[in-house]
Amino acid sequence: MFSSLYPLARASLFKMDAEDAHHLTLRALGAAGRTGLACALSARVPDAPRTVMGLTFRNPVGLAAGLDKDGAAIDGLAALGFGFIEVGTVTPRPQPGNPRPRMFRLPQAEALINRMGFNNHGVDQFVKNVQAARYRGILGLNIGKNADTPIERAAEDYLYCLERVYPFASYVTINISSPNTKNLRQLQGAGELDALLAALKDKQQRLADLHGKLVPLALKIAPDLDDEQVKEIGDTLLRHKIEAVIATNTTLSRAAVQGLPHADEAGGLSGRPVFDASNEVIRKLHAEVGNDVPIIGVGGIFSGEDARAKLAAGAALVQLYTGFIYRGPALVSECVKAIARERTA
C-alpha cells in the first residue's frame, strides 16, 4: 500500500527542508510501528534467504545506517520489506551534530549531501529504543565516537558502545568512515585500524564469553580510498578475522555534481554519483579478501540492476539509503526480485 502512495508523499516531502522531511517520515514510521499500523505499510517482498556472517537473512536487501540514527522507527521500517535493518550511528553520549542546515538534496543528480555529524540521543536511549522494538529479524547496530573525543582515544568510545549494544545486536558495525566527524577517517590508516580492530576483537571475545553468543563485527569504509589503502584495509580485516565489511560510506568527491545547486556544500555525497566509486572499492576489496570477509555493498542503488551490479562486483548483501529516499519502498521489492532472478537464471 505505502509503495503505491510513496510518489505522492515524496512530492510533498521534497517541497520541505530535507532534514524536516526526514524527521517527519521517521516520526510517521515510528508511530506506525508503535500503534500496530505498520501492517498497513507491509510490502509484499518475496523471501530470498541468504546466510552471511553466520546469520540467515530473509532477503539480501537491507536498510543502511543513517536513516534511523536512534532506532526509533525499527518496526515501521521493517514492515517495508527489508531483509535486514541497520540503525545508528550512535555515540556514547548524546550530541547535537553539526549546525543546520546540514542536509541537501541534489535532485538533478538523484543525490544527497549531508554533514549531520552523528547527531543522536546517546547509546543509553538507543538501547532502550532497540529493546522496545518488536522486530525480530536481523538488526545491525552501528556505533561511532563522540565529536569531542580525541581521535587518540576513539577506541574507548567504540569499546563502550560495543559493550552496551552487544546483547541486542545481530551484528555491530564500526563506523570509521563518516566525513562529518573531524579526523574520523584517520582510523582507516593501517596502524590506527590495526590497533582499533585488535581492541574490538578482544572485547568481542570477552562479551561472547559473557553472553554466550558471538555477535559479528562489520567495518564501514569510505569510497575515497586508493589501491594501497584498500589493500591495507583488506589485509587488516583478514588478520583480525573481522566478520564483514560495508562498502561504502559517502564520498567527498564532487566531480559528478559540479555546477549543481548545493554541490559546493560541505559533507558526504550519496546517491547515484557514488555508485561507480563504491563498486570499484567493492571489486578491489573482494580481490583482496575473497569470500573470507563478506562485503555488504551500499552506494547509489536505484534499481534492481544496480543491486545486481553490486553483487557482481563482489558483495554478498546490499543496503539502500538515498535510492530508498528517492524511489521509496518499491525499490526494496525490485532489488530482491532482481537478485532472485539472477540466482535462478
From Swiss-Prot:
Taxonomy of the source species: Bacteria, Pseudomonadati, Pseudomonadota, Betaproteobacteria, Burkholderiales
Organism for this UniProt entry: Burkholderia cenocepacia (strain ATCC BAA-245 / DSM 16553 / LMG 16656 / NCTC 13227 / J2315 / CF5610)
Gene giving rise to this polypeptide: pyrD
Protein name in the entry: Dihydroorotate dehydrogenase (quinone)
UniProt keyword rRNA processing present: no
Enzyme class label: oxidoreductase
Pathway involvement of the protein, from the record: Pyrimidine metabolism; UMP biosynthesis via de novo pathway; orotate from (S)-dihydroorotate (quinone route): step 1/1
Keyword Ribonucleoprotein among UniProt keywords: no
UniProt xrefs under PROSITE patterns: DHODEHASE_1 (PS00911), DHODEHASE_2 (PS00912)
Keywords: Cell membrane, Flavoprotein, FMN, Membrane, Oxidoreductase, Pyrimidine biosynthesis
Coiled-coil stretches: none
Functional description taken from the UniProt entry: Catalyzes the conversion of dihydroorotate to orotate with quinone as electron acceptor.
Quaternary organization: Monomer.
